[in-house]
Regions:
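Helicase P-loop NTPase motor core
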Residues: 31-33, 39-45, 53, 59, ...
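Conserved helicase NTPase motor core
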Residues: 7-37, 44, 63-64, 71-72, ...
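Short glycine-/polar-rich loops that comprise or flank the Walker A/P-loop
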Residues: 57-61, 96-99, 137, 260-263, ...
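Conserved P-loop NTPase-based nucleic-acid remodeling module centered on helicase motor cores
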Residues: 61-163, 286, 343
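Coupling/switch/interface segments within P-loop NTPase motor domains and analogous charged loops
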Residues: 131-203
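Walker A/P-loop NTP-binding motif
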Residues: 43-58, 78-82, 255-257, 292
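Acidic, low-complexity intrinsically disordered tails
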Residues: 1-8, 650-689
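Conserved helicase C-terminal RecA-like lobe
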Residues: 181, 185, 237, 368, ...
Length: 689
C-alpha cells in the first residue's frame, strides 16, 4: 500500500490510493466506483459515508441503499466506528453518525410509501405479502377468471407471478417479456394481461402490496414532479451498493431522486452481475456515466486483499474474454507458488469422492471445515456430494435451499400476525382461519366476506357463528383477535400470544411438533429484536433469513462444519479453500441459459464470482460424464460432457491440470513368453461342418 501524505487524516491513512480517491471524491458530483472482488468495497463505501459525515453532512439526510438488511446494518456499524475513532469517543456523542435512512430499495420504498400513504391513496396500514402469498392470490384470481380450466395448459400460479414480476422490474412490455423469457406462453398474452389487471384489483381491495409493488408504487410516485422534488430534497447524498444487481425500475427510481446526479455515488462490479433471473441488468452500471452531463466520474479499485495472485490471474483471464466490461485486472500482494487446479474426474460419484478427500486432507493439514466451501451453479448439483458427506459423517450446512420463512408452521404463525394487523388481507386470513378444526375454504371465505363489508372487523368476527367442529377453538381465536386488534397491542408480547395460541394447532397438525416448536422459539427471539409489529412484518418479508443462517439455527459456533452453497448465495463471501463443481457445458453455462449473448455472459460472470471467493486454494472439478434420468425416448443413460467454454485452451496455462483418481503405478513385471496365435475364425467355421 502506498504511504499516505503526512497531512492525511488518520481514518484515511489505512486506505490505498484508489480507495482514498473514491472516499474523498467531490461529494456533489456523480461518482461510479468500480470495486473488483475482494478490493475492500464495503470498507471503502463505509469510509466515504463517514467522510461525508465528518465533512459536515447530516447523517439523517444520507440515503444508503444496500442489497440486504444485514449489509445495511453492517455498513451502519462501520460508519459509526470510523466516525467515533476519528473524533474520539467523547467528542462523538450519542448518535453522531447514526444513519436513519439505510436499507434495501424495497425496505426504503415501504417506509416512504407509509409516510406518503395519504397522498398516494394508500392505507397506512397496508401489509406486504411474500412471494408465496402473492402466488396464492394470483391463483385465486386465475381461478375466478376461469383460466385454470383451460384445455391448453395455462401457466401455473408461480409462473404467472414470475411473468408479472419480470414485466414490472424490467419495465418491458408483456409481449417482449413473453417472447424473450416465456415463449411457450406467448399465446396467452391477452389472458395474462386480464389476469394481471385482476390481480392488481384484488391487492388494492385487500390493502396489500406485493414485493414488486414497493418499487412500482415508489417509481410511480416519483413520476409526479412535485413528489420527486419533495422526496429528492430529503437527501443530500444517495449512495448505492451492489449497483450491478439493480433492475430497470430501481435505476429509474434513483435517477428520479437525483436527476442531475448531485450527491449520487454508486458502487459495484460489472464482472459480478449475476441476478438477471430477478430482473437485474448489467446495463445499469455499464451505462451509468453517460446518464449525466458531464459524465459521471469513475474510480476503479483493483487491488485485491482476498486471493493469491495465481488465483487472480486465472480469474482475470476468464472474465477478460467477456464481450463487454470495464477494463479491470485485479492484483494482489499475496504471492503463491500454487496455481488453481482443474481436476478431471470420471463422473459425479468420483467428483464427490475427490472433493471429500481434498477437504479431509486439508483439514488434516490444519484447515478447518468452516474455512472450506463447495460451490455449484444449481442447488441440485450437490446431491451426490451430500450423500458422500453423510456417508463419511462430515457435518455441513447448505445455503441456497429452502428458506426459513417457507416452512409451513412459520408461515402459519406469520399469517395470523399479518391478518390481525390488517384484517382485510384475505390471503393471510384464509390461511389463519383454516388452522381451526372444521374450518375449510368455504367457511373461511364466509368469515372473510363478513369482515370485508364490516365497519369494524372485530365485530364481524364476534358476530359470526362458528361451525360446530370449531366451536371449542373459536373463543380462543376471538380472544387473540381482541388483544392484537387493540390500538396499542404491546410488542413483542403480541407475537408471543400468537405462538401460544398456535401451539395446540401445531401439535394437532404435525407429528414432529417439538422440532417445529423450536423454530417458533427462534422466531420469537427474532421478533424481540424489532421495535414494532409493522417493522417486524416488513423486514422479514423483504429480507428473510435463510434456513441455515444464524437466525434460524445453524450448528453452534464452536462446531466445525463444511459450507455448501449455490454461487448466487456465496456472493460477498470468502473461504480459504473453494471447490467448484460441474465446470462443464450444460451446467456452467446452464443448458437453460444459452439462448442469448447476455445469458452466456452472465454465466461467465457466475464462474468468475465462484473463482474469486477463494483465498488460498481453488479446485475446479470437471466430470466427464453424467447419469441422467427420464430423458425423452432414450431413458436413463450416461451423457458425456466437455469442459466449460469459459475455460478455453488459451487460459489453461494459468491452471494446474490433472486427472483423479491418478492411474495406478505400473509395477516392473518379468518378461512374458509370447502368447500362441489362435485361428478363431477357423474354429467358428468348423463348428458347422
Amino acid at each position: 500500500m502506498d504511504a499516505a501524505a503526512p497531512d492525511t487524516p488518520a481514518y484515511l491513512s489505512t486506505l490505498n490510493p484508489e480507495q482514498r480517491a473514491a472516499v474523498t471524491h467531490e461529494p456533489a458530483a456523480p461518482l461510479l466506483i468500480i470495486a473488483g472482488a475482494g478490493s475492500g468495497k464495503t470498507n471503502t463505501l463505509a469510509h466515504r459515508v463517514a467522510h461525508l459525515v465528518l465533512g459536515g453532512a447530516d447523517p439523517r439526510r444520507i440515503l444508503l441503499l444496500t442489497f440486504s438488511r444485514r449489509a445495511a446494518s453492517e455498513m451502519g456499524r462501520r460508519v459509526e466506528r470510523i466516525v467515533d475513532q476519528a473524533l474520539g469517543m467523547q467528542a462523538c456523542g450519542a448518535g453522531r453518525a447514526a444513519l436513519t435512512w439505510s436499507g434495501t430499495f424495497h425496505a426504503i420504498g415501504a417506509r416512504l410509501l407509509r409516510e406518503y400513504a395519504e397522498t398516494l391513496g394508500l392505507s397506512p396500514s397496508f401489509t406486504i405479502c411474500d412471494r408465496g402469498d402473492a402466488a396464492d392470490l394470483m391463483n385465486v384470481v386465475r381461478h375466478d377468471l376461469g383460466l385454470s380450466a383451460q384445455a391448453s395448459r395455462f401457466p401455473r400460479k408461480e409462473t404467472c407471478l414470475s411473468i408479472y414480476s419480470r414485466v414490472v422490474n424490467t419495465q418491458a412490455p408483456l409481449e417482449d417479456v413473453l417472447k424473450q423469457w416465456f415463449p411457450r406462453y406467448a399465446m396467452w398474452t391477452d389472458a395474462l394481461r386480464g389476469l394481471f389487471a385482476g390481480y392488481v384489483q384484488a391487492k388494492q381491495k385487500q390493502q396489500v402490496l406485493d414485493y414488486d409493488d414497493l418499487l412500482l408504487y415508489w417509481a410511480q410516485a416519483l413520476a409526479e414532479p412535485a413528489l420527486a422534488q419533495d422526496m429528492g430534497a430529503r437527501f443530500d447524498h444517495v449512495l448505492v451498493d451492489e449497483y450491478q444487481d439493480t433492475n430497470a425500475l430501481q435505476a429509474a427510481i434513483l435517477l428520479a431522486l437525483k436527476p442531475d446526479g448531485r450527491g449520487l455515488t454508486v458502487v459495484g462490479d460489472d464482472a459480478q452481475s449475476i441476478y438477471a433471473f430477478r430482473g437485474a441488468t448489467v446495463r445499469n452500471i455499464l451505462d451509468f456515466p453517460a446518464q449525466f452531463t458531464p459524465a459521471a466520474d469513475m474510480v476503479t479499485l483493483s487491488q485485491n486483499y482476498r486471493s493469491t495472485q495465481p488465483i487472480l490471474a486465472a480469474a482475470n483471464a476468464v472474465i477478460g474474454l467477456a464481450a463487454e466490461r470495464y477494463t479491470k485486472d485485479l492484483w494482489s500482494e499475496r504471492g503463491s507458488a500454487e496455481k488453481p487446479e482443474i481436476v478431471v474426474v470420471n463422473d459425479e460419484a468420483d467428483q464427490a469422492r475427490y472433493v471429500v478427500e481434498q477437504i479431509l486432507s486439508r483439514r488434516e493439514a490444519g484447515l478447518a471445515l468452516l474455512s472450506q466451501a463447495v460451490l455449484f451453479r444449481a442447488a441440485d448439483h450437490s446431491a451426490q456430494l451430500e450423500i458422500e458427506l453423510v456417508r463419511r459423517n462430515i457435518p455441513f450446512v447448505k445455503f441456497g435451499g429452502l428458506k426459513f420463512l417457507e416452512s409451513t408452521h412459520v408461515k402459519d404463525v406469520l399469517a395470523v400476525v399479518r391478518w390481525l394487523e390488517n384484517p382485510r388481507d384475505r390471503m393471510a386470513g384464509f390461511r389463519s382461519l383454516q388452522l381451526l378444526p372444521g374450518v375449510g375454504p368455504k367457511t373461511a371465505a364466509r368469515v372473510l366476506d363478513a369482515v370485508e363489508i364490516a365497519t369494524e372487523p372485530l365485530f364481524a368476527l364476534e358476530s359470526f357463528e362458528a361451525p360446530p367442529a370449531a366451536a371449542e377453538a373459536w373463543p380462543d381465536l376471538l380472544a387473540l383477535a381482541r388483544s392484537l386488534m387493540a390500538p396499542a397491542a404491546p410488542w413483542p408480547s403480541a407475537f408471543e400470544q400468537v405462538v401460544a395460541w398456535y401451539q395446540p394447532h401445531l401439535e394437532r397438525l404435525h407429528d414432529d411438533a417439538p422440532a417445529r416448536a423450536a423454530d417458533l422459539q427462534q422466531l420469537e427471539r427474532i421478533a424481540a429484536t424489532y421495535a414494532s409489529r409493522e417493522r417486524f412484518l416488513t423486514e422479514l418479508t423483504l429480507d428473510p433469513p435463510d434456513a441455515s443462517s444464524d437466525e434460524s439455527g445453524v450448528p453452534l459456533r464452536d462446531e466445525d462444519y463444511l459450507i455448501l452453497s449455490t454461487i448466487h448465495s456465496a456472493k460477498g463471501q470468502e473461504w480459504k479453500a473453494v471447490y467448484v463443481l460441474n465446470a462443464v457445458d450444460g451446467c456452467m453455462p446452464s443448458d437453460l441459459a444459452t439462448g442469448t449473448t447476455e445469458e452466456i455472459e452472465e454465466e461467465r460472470r457466475l464462474l468468475y464470482v465462484a473463482m474469486t471467493r477463494a483465498r488460498d486454494h481453488l479446485d475446479i472439478v470437471v466430470p466427464q460424464r453424467f447419469y441422467v434420468h427420464q430423458q425423452t425416448a432414450y431413458g436413463d443413460r450416461h451423457v458425456y460432457a466437455s469442459r466449460t467454454r469459459f475455460l478455453p485452451n488459451r487460459v489453461m496455462p494459468l491452471f494446474h491440470s490433472r486427472s483423479w483418481p491418478p492411474p495406478p503405478p505400473v509395477a516392473d513385471a518379468p518378461a512374458k513368453a509370447p502368447l500362441p496365435r489362435l485361428d478363431l475364425a477357423g474354429r467358428m467355421r468348423d463348428m458347422w461342418k
